[in-house]
Each structure stands twice: as C-alpha cells, then as structure tokens.
Design a protein with these regions (language model features):
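Helix-rich terminal scaffold detector
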Residues: 1-106, 118-130, 134-135, 140-145, ...
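Short beta-strand/loop turn elements enriched in aromatics
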Residues: 148-177
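Short, charged beta-turn/beta-strand-edge "cap" motif at the junction between a beta-strand
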Residues: 204-210
Length: 219
C-alpha cells in the first residue's frame, strides 16, 4: 500500500514565487505609481511580476520619460544597486554615474536594499554639484505607496506660472519663503521628488468648508 510520501509525490510541482520576487514586485508597482504622480510616462501594460528582472546581483536600470519637460531633469533612470545585503559603497555609485553620463541622463533614483555608506552618500552630494540629481531610497520605503495612506492629504505641485499667480494673490512680492514650508526630507516630499523653492498645494477634508487648502514652499 502506498504511504503518504508516495501520495504527496504525485502532486504537480508548481513553482511558487519567492519572497524576494514578491517583494521586488511590490517595489516595482510603487515605483510605477510614484513616477506616474511625478508626471512621467509609465507602461500600463507592465506586469508587476516582471520585477523579478531586478535581481540584486546586477545593477539594472529602467528609464522613465517625462510627459512634460517643465520642472524635470529630462528622463529619470532608476537603478537597483548590486550590493546585496550590505550598504552600497562608492564603487557602485561611480559605476552608476558613468552609465548616467554615457546615456546623457541627469536624473537618477538609486534603490538600495539597506542604504548607502557615508562615503557613497558624500559621492552623491558631490556629483549633484555638477548639475546631476540623484535620489536614493531603501527598498523598505518603496514597499507601499505613501500617498495611499488614509491620513495623507492630496498634494499638487504648482507650475512656475501657478506659483507666481499665488504669490501675487497673497501679495508676497514674489517671495515664496514667506509661505509655510515643507522639508525635502518629508516622506511625501521625497516621494514626489520635490526640490527647493517649489510650492505644493495641500488639500485636506474640512468639517466646515468641505475642503481646506494650504500652500507650502519646499525648504
């Protein structure tokens, strides 16, 4: 008589997605949502399961094209750094910068598993002095869409023309620094890629007027 072991062996061997693959799929979805909110074109047909190509053994890249050139550095390249299980050092940063230069990219997002070493952070700051913008995220920050949290109000980045109209309406003599501020280190500011001097419109539900609107300058 066949025992339990022979019965179980007759079951089809179906490969299950690894935890790493599922994690990377979530990151890929969040990246697409984030870049969409920033005004970049995103392939709507991209299957999240394709995130498996972002294997941390190699530096892999995806480039996003902006829908509008206003307020952007042109295409944004997203790199998944290769130092699996460790902080990313200067070497991978230099390799990424070389690839950016060869591809004529001036804006990049680097996704690291556990962060960057202090020298790598310094290297990023130095390259940004040359007019290149580099943003860094750890994977844990991209496991969810911060804008989908029920307590996060709607944020809309004003165009330069809208900003000028606002400053005139508030009679601020063109000085946006007189507005309340939001720091570039704020999670929503980082998610939206806000930079110094930009103005963001924040809409919150209000019990009296239905919707409360405030404006903040990025500091």
């Amino acid at each position: 008589m066949d025992g339990p072991s022979s019965a179980s062996s007759s079951q089809p061997d179906v490969a299950q997605p690894s935890r790493s693959t599922a994690r990377l799929a979530r990151i890929a979805r969040t990246l697409n949502q984030m870049m969409t909110k920033r005004g970049y074109e995103v392939d709507d047909d991209l299957d999240a399961a394709e995130a498996v190509i972002y294997d941390r053994r190699t530096d892999l890249e995806r480039a996003y094209e902006p829908i509008s050139a206003e307020g952007t550095y042109g295409p944004c390249a997203v790199y998944f750094a290769a130092d699996k299980g460790a902080k990313v050092g200067v070497g991978p940063i230099r390799s990424i910068v070389q690839r950016m230069r060869s591809d004529d990219h001036h804006h990049a997002i680097i996704v690291a598993e556990v962060g960057l070493t202090p020298p790598a952070k310094k290297a990023c700051r130095m390259i940004q002095e040359e007019g290149v913008r580099i943003e860094t995220f750890v994977e844990a920050e991209l496991l969810y869409d911060v804008m989908e949290h029920e307590f996060v109000p709607n944020h809309t980045v004003l165009t330069e023309a809208e900003k000028e109209l606002l400053l005139r309406r508030f009679r601020l003599d063109g000085d946006a620094t007189l507005l309340p501020y939001i720091l570039t280190t704020d999670p929503v500011a980082r998610y939206l890629g806000l930079t110094h001097g930009q103005v963001v419109k924040i809409e919150r539900p209000s019990t009296t007027s239905g919707k409360g609107v405030t404006y903040r300058v990025v500091k």
